């Protein structure tokens, strides 16, 4: 998982889901797990 400043480009990818956990924003992509990231 990468830690990124901006998730805007990742959430446009096909299969991307934006999820909030414990006040942090995550992008999870089951189609392409390379694009899994947390905002920080």
From Swiss-Prot:
Its GO CC terms are: ribonucleoprotein complex; ribosome
Q: Which GO-annotated molecular functions does the record name? A: structural constituent of ribosome
Q: Which InterPro entries match?
A: Ribosomal_bL36, Ribosomal_bL36_sp, Ribosomal_L36_bact
Does this entry carry the keyword Oxidoreductase? Answer: no
Entry keyword set: Ribonucleoprotein, Ribosomal protein
User: This protein's superkingdom?
Assistant: Bacteria
Ribosomal protein as a keyword of this entry, yes or no, is yes
Matches recorded under Pfam families: Ribosomal_L36
Q: Which GO terms describe its biological process?
A: translation
Name the family: Belongs to the bacterial ribosomal protein bL36 family.
Name of this chain's protein: Large ribosomal subunit protein bL36
């Amino acid at each position: 998982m990468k830690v990124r400043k901006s998730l805007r480009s990742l959430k446009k990818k096909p299969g991307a889901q934006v999820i909030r956990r414990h006040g942090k924003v995550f992008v999870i992509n089951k189609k392409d797990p390379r694009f899994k990231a947390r905002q920080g």
